[in-house]
Structure formats: structure tokens, C-alpha cells
Amino acid sequence: MEKVKIGIIGGSGLYSPDFLTNPKEEKIYTPYGPPSSHVVIGEIAGRKVAFIPRHGKRHEIPPHKVNYRANIYALKELGVERLISVSAVGSLREDYKPGDFVCTDQFIDMTKGRVYTFYDGPVVAHVSMADPFCPELRELCIRSARKLGITMHEKGTYICIEGPRFSTRAESRLWRQFGADIIGMTLVPEVNLAREARMCFLNIAMVTDYDVWAEKPVTAHEVARVMAENTEKVKRLLADLIPSIPEERKCQCARALDEALI
């Protein structure tokens, strides 16, 4: 099995590997069951990349049913060290507008009933999540967005809810009081599993609409239009970001388990 150091998990809107050259599918078996789909290995600007659509090829897997452990394990088996997660999100702030991107730097976990760790015993891991996202990847991502003229907010707190339903207005107002900037359903447990796998993790959050706190009428047509535009923008962003990633890691992400195991 060929080794691939960079992985991409595609969210809503990013299901097809058509942004990769020389794509080929790899079927990977994991102790946690099958991943969301076969892993597609291809290239971006000459760099090998492994891609998994989080919700399956046709968005047939809801967020609370995604096999997050299998997805991360499959990418780890391929040798992935840097993982780029792409997510569609709602905005909890007036200035984070539909069509904007956010380079997430913090998260709040409001999920329930998901499987959050690879270490269910007898070995237990308590990984630090004080700074959940790789500073090296975040810096490169922000730089690429600026270069391409893509509006990207350099910081943002992502509140992850269980789904698949959306928030009530009361909940949406509460999330704003919590200090959350964007809302989605898939960041957790993806981010903590990647940390346990010693991966560098980056989340590119694409704002599709305002959450219900704003009480602004949103049509399915408008959301679909923004999502399509976001998908094309994120492909351009990935095409610029991937070749800028250095071969060797200088961050501390690979040492996440050094003092975490009991």
C-alpha cells in the first residue's frame, strides 16, 4: 500500500474527487468497520493526497452516523500526517457572512452519544485539546486564502451539535452567548481522533447561511447556490495550499500522546 502524507475529508458539497489528478480508489479495512467510502488517492500539484467524503459519495450518511474512527484509522494506515477537514457551517455572527470561510481555531462540543476515542481501555488517553488545530497548517491556509482573495476569518469557535436536526431559535441564541462563531455537526469527534492519531489537523469551515438566531428567511435555492460557490472556492484553496505544505513537520502535533497515555 502506497504511503500518502496528506489527507482531506470532504464535507457537504465536497463529495467528488474531481479536484484530484490520477485518482484511484483504495479499499481499506479497519477494526472499526468500513470508512464512509473507499479512499481515493490522487495528486494536487504533484503532491499525493488521500480523500474521503465524510457523508459518502451521495451524502447518504448523516453526521451522527459517520464512522469517524474508521475514517481516521484508514487515513492513518495510508501514512497520513496532515489532515485537512472541510465543513459546511452556519454563522452565529453578523460579520461571518454566507460565502465566507473560517479557519477554525477552537471548538465547543455539544454532541452526545458518539465514540470519541481510540483508547477505550485497558490503555487510556487524555490528550490535550487546549489548541486543537495545527498552527503550521492554519498559517499556511490563511496565507493561501489571502493570496487568492478568498474571504477567510482567521479565527472562529465552531460549536458542534449532534444533529441531524438544526437548532431551535432558543438554542441558537444560547450558542451565541457561549461565544461560538459558527455551527456545524461533524467536527467532533473527528478533531480529537486526529489528535490521538498524532495528525496535524486543519478545519476549513465554509459558511452557507446564518443560523436561525438571525431570523432571516433562507431558501434552499440560496443555500445551494452558496454551497456550490464555496465548493469551487475550496478547490482553488486546496490547490494552492497543498503544494505549500513542507515535507517535514515543525509543529508539536506528532507528540500529542507523549504525556497522554495511562
Swiss-Prot record:
Pfam family, one: PNP_UDP_1
Residues involved in phosphate binding: 12, 54-55, 87-88, 186
Binding residues for substrate: 185, 209-211
Keywords: Glycosyltransferase, Purine salvage, Transferase
Protein's UniProt keywords contain Protease: no
Top EC class for this record: transferase
CDD domains, A to Z: MTAP_SsMTAPII_like_MTIP (cd09010)
Molecular-function annotations in GO: S-methyl-5-thioadenosine phosphorylase activity
Pathway it works in: Amino-acid biosynthesis; L-methionine biosynthesis via salvage pathway; S-methyl-5-thio-alpha-D-ribose 1-phosphate from S-methyl-5'-thioadenosine (phosphorylase route): step 1/1
Site entry: Important for substrate specificity: 167, 220
Superkingdom classification of source: Archaea
Subunit details: Homohexamer. Dimer of a homotrimer.
Free-text function comment from the UniProt entry: Catalyzes the reversible phosphorylation of S-methyl-5'-thioadenosine (MTA) to adenine and 5-methylthioribose-1-phosphate. Involved in the breakdown of MTA, a major by-product of polyamine biosynthesis. Responsible for the first step in the methionine salvage pathway after MTA has been generated from S-adenosylmethionine. Has broad substrate specificity with 6-aminopurine nucleosides as preferred substrates.
UniProt protein name: S-methyl-5'-thioadenosine phosphorylase
